[in-house]
């Protein structure tokens, strides 16, 4: 995993997310993967950006999401690019669902547990404050834990 200062070619956000950092910097993240070792390397490489750092990624999927997640360092923008997506937030124990179609977006407030379900093939773009992101298996109807509880410090 490495941050690239200048990428002259097109970037596929599905395989190469872009880190938005302090000073309005945008750096492609080559070799990014959703495994603990790479996430740790990414977190270390962008630590100086703190809560102001953002990761821009496109996800393609089909069906329900596996996990609840929350981002205590900042809000997350979720944009539906294609298909239909339902974002479910846990608001004081009550599910709050937002259905998105192509071109529609929603903002998950900082610290709010949320999950994303795709009704058939769909794509989303996310802009995420990754510092301190927490994940919980989606084995129950809602996540456990409180908004202030600490968790793994990965994007």
Residue ranges and their predicted role:
Residues 101, 110-135:
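Ligand-binding loop in jelly-roll beta-barrel domains
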Residues 53, 74-77, 122:
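Short, surface-exposed beta-edge/turn micro-motifs
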